[in-house]
Amino acid sequence: MTELIKKGSAAKEAAQFLAQATTKQKNTALLNLSNDLLAHTSTLLKENEKDILRAQKKGTPETMIDRLRLTEDRMKEISEAVKQVVALKDPIGEVTNMWKNEAELTIGKTRVPLGVIGIIYESRPNVTVDASVLCFKTGNAVILRGGSDAIDSNKALMSVIQDSLEASGFPRSSVQLIEDTSRETARDMMRLNRFLDVLIPRGGARLIQTVLENATVPVIETGTGNCHIYVDKAAEKQMAIDILVNAKCSRPSVCNAAETLLIHRDVAEDYLPAMETALKEYDVELRADERAKEILQEAKAAKESDWEDEFLDFILAVKVVDSAEEAIEHINKYGTKHSEAIISNDYATGQAFHQKVDAAAVYINASTRFTDGFAMGFGAEIGISTQKLHARGPMGLTELTSTKYIIFGDGQIRN
């Protein structure tokens, strides 16, 4: 708890400094950081290798190790991502609305930082940089608590970030890492209302549920991604295959990857064998309901838990449905309100799907893999929010701000 209080207090002070920083000052610091990350790539990769070796000894699945791994190419991507944040418009100070009331007061609504943001996340060291940069750009101080699997990578990255920001004239406490990765410290952080204005968990279902059950700090839930592809009877066969393979296989360990295929009974016998062939190239394990299992050559019988799980692996649950309505009911029952897709050339069915499915992102004839800040065209994101307050969907710079009312008068008093 001592580490949390010390760093929480320092973050509060840093937040006041950051709130006054100009866009030019912040962008200059971020450009310097981008260069410093590249300059320290060799050291960072050596520290990352410690985490990789430890994970391999534990028997961690390769798909999860991939999330942990840093390479020269990934460091270049991380460095470039920092530059892309520099290019984004700074929302701080933006006047979103202005008007006069009956008392002739001029009332303005402007964007301000949230203050101090806490982020608890798992084994993805790139998040250490992404979160630091996004919070910094929006004038927020941030306290990070990464998973134990990535502790050496995170400590090395944090050292580079803090040294770089300090050299640019900013407090080291603008961005801080909790090095104690124990569950007790994580739970203490969830109750750090005295210093944290908001807490954002990024990770699997267990982590997020733990935060929701224990936090007294306001939470923005970045949910798990039990994403579905529904292939309608009016779907184009090759389009359905291409989208399914991309959504499942391009990067199965991320939250916008597809986990369940729902397919209309009228096209199941024709489409499923071709889909199985395409997925076989990636050694995807299929877990099917009774009707789908009769059509597929190699599939395990699906359990109830398979409809609920976020596999984050080359595993796909498959179910044959009688109608689009049944698909929608299934998604709303088992989905995590993240990203859902329908493949159909029937306009009315597509409209019904997007109106009735409860999710942050609903796709018609496109892969769920586009639920991403960069892919959607508004830059880096802190996570994908699956709740409806304070933000929903990919959380970019604007979602890391609050608003303040500025009222100008010339002596008015209220009667």
UniProtKB/Swiss-Prot annotation:
Q: Does the keyword Oxidoreductase apply?
A: yes
SUPFAM superfamilies for this protein: ALDH-like
EC number(s)? Answer: 1.2.1.41
Q: Which reaction does it catalyse?
A: L-glutamate 5-semialdehyde + phosphate + NADP(+) = L-glutamyl 5-phosphate + NADPH + H(+)
UniProt keywords, alphabetically: Amino-acid biosynthesis, Cytoplasm, NADP, Oxidoreductase, Proline biosynthesis
**Which PROSITE patterns does the UniProt entry name for this protein?**
PROA
Per its UniProt record, what InterPro entries does this chain match? Ald_DH/histidinol_DH, Ald_DH_C, Ald_DH_N, Aldehyde_DH_dom, G-glutamylP_reductase_CS, Glu-5-SA_DH, GPR_dom
Provide the GO biological process annotations.
Answer: L-proline biosynthetic process
Q: What class of enzyme is it?
A: oxidoreductase
Task: Give the Gene Ontology MF terms in alphabetical order.
Answer: glutamate-5-semialdehyde dehydrogenase activity; NADP binding
Which pathway is it part of? Amino-acid biosynthesis; L-proline biosynthesis; L-glutamate 5-semialdehyde from L-glutamate: step 2/2
Intrachain S-S bonds: none
User: Where found?
Assistant: Cytoplasm
Q: Name one GO cellular component term.
A: cytoplasm
Q: What does this protein do?
A: Catalyzes the NADPH-dependent reduction of L-glutamate 5-phosphate into L-glutamate 5-semialdehyde and phosphate. The product spontaneously undergoes cyclization to form 1-pyrroline-5-carboxylate.
Q: Which family does it belong to?
A: Belongs to the gamma-glutamyl phosphate reductase family.
Q: What is this protein called?
A: Gamma-glutamyl phosphate reductase
Organism annotation: Listeria monocytogenes serotype 4a (strain HCC23)
Q: What is the lineage of its organism?
A: Bacteria, Bacillati, Bacillota, Bacilli, Bacillales
